[in-house]
Swiss-Prot record:
This is tRNA dimethylallyltransferase. The keyword ATP-binding applies. The gene is miaA. It catalyses: adenosine(37) in tRNA + dimethylallyl diphosphate = N(6)-dimethylallyladenosine(37) in tRNA + diphosphate. It comes from the Bacteria. Transmembrane segments: none annotated. The record marks T104, R126 as: Interaction with substrate tRNA. SUPFAM superfamilies: P-loop containing nucleoside triphosphate hydrolases (SSF52540).
Length: 303
């Protein structure tokens, strides 16, 4: 078994770039514990649609935080970071290399740069705001935020309803701009000098094709049944899992609201758009990561 020259390994990248397969090979070679850094793979409901490792793959190396959380839970970055700290201690005591793998840039940013201490938003405030803004266009949310919190509005895209709602929730709950909390960060969990961080960067056209093909393969392998089971749970549509890529459109088809081919087209479109955002986030928010073609990444990690 090879010996690592670092105390933690981070494998990030866009969806469908081959992160999980690479991380598993490296865990086998380096004696690693795989720690999930994907905000959808933490949930147990959608193994297929979230591309979570299979049960057979999970037997090949220790896996942590994969399918660990019920879909009814709003599992925040702070909760994930707390769990990650505990697993890091487990890895150290076992003499195993912690290997973080996933596509959620915010998780990696929290690990390597620290996390802002943002107060929890009470459920009643969140529910009232969600009810008031249901069906409201993202551009209208941005206009409201611009009027009430221009500093934060300037940082957010008018096409990003999730982050716009988050900014409005914090404003409602605290009377303060989310920007004021983001300016104060706790210390990073990992020492950047002792961490190897890699961002997989496949060629864009090939990645888009792989995304489309994988989405079709997921549907053929049982994703429809997964989504139907999730739909029957009657969870709040605002929960993170209910907004997973493809889920709203597949549910819309299952409820007879849109044709099947339209649901599939929109699911693929949203996943490709997510991949573009992952590239953008990494470029601007993850400065310590080395970008590598997938075929070069294993050698880079082992060097």
């Amino acid at each position: 078994m090879a010996a690592a020259k670092f105390t933690a390994l981070l494998i990030a990248g866009p969806t469908a770039s081959g992160k999980s397969a690479l991380a598993l090979r490296l865990a086998e070679k380096l004696g690693g514990i795989l720690i999930n850094a994907d905000s959808m793979q933490v949930y147990r409901d959608l193994r297929i649609l979230s591309a979570r490792p299979s049960a057979e793959e999970e037997l090949r190396a220790p896996h942590r935080l994969f399918g660990a959380i019920d879909g009814a839970v709003n599992f925040s970055v702070g909760l994930w970071l707390e769990a990650a700290r505990n697993i890091l201690e487990e890895a150290r005591q076992a003499g195993a290399l912690p290997i973080f793998v996933g596509g959620t840039g915010l998780y990696f940013k929290a690990l390597t740069q620290g996390l802002s201490d943002i107060p929890a938003v009470p459920d009643d405030i969140r529910a009232k705001l969600r009810a008031r803004t249901e069906g409201v266009a993202a551009t209208e949310l941005h206009a409201e935020l611009s009027a009430r919190d221009p500093l934060m509005a300037a940082r957010l895209r008018p096409s990003d309803p999730q982050r716009l709602l988050r900014a409005l929730e914090v404003l409602e709950a605290t009377g303060r701009s989310l920007a004021s909390f983001q300016s104060r960060r706790g210390p990073p969990v990992l020492d950047p000098a002792a961490t190897r961080a890699i961002f997989l960067s496949p060629e864009r056209a090939a990645l888009n094709l792989r995304i489309d093909e994988r989405f079709e393969a997921m549907l053929a392998s049982g994703a429809w049944a997964e989504v139907e089971a999730l739909r029957r749970r009657g969870l709040d549509p605002a929960l993170p899992l209910m907004r997973a890529h493809g889920v709203p459109h597949l549910i819309a088809h299952l409820e007879g609201k849109i044709p099947q081919d339209e649901a599939i087209r929109l699911g693929k479109r949203d996943t490709r758009a997510y991949a573009r955002r992952q590239f953008t986030f990494a470029r601007h928010q993850l400065p310590g990561f080395v970008w590598a073609e997938p075929r070069e990444a294993e050698a880079l990690a082992l060097a």
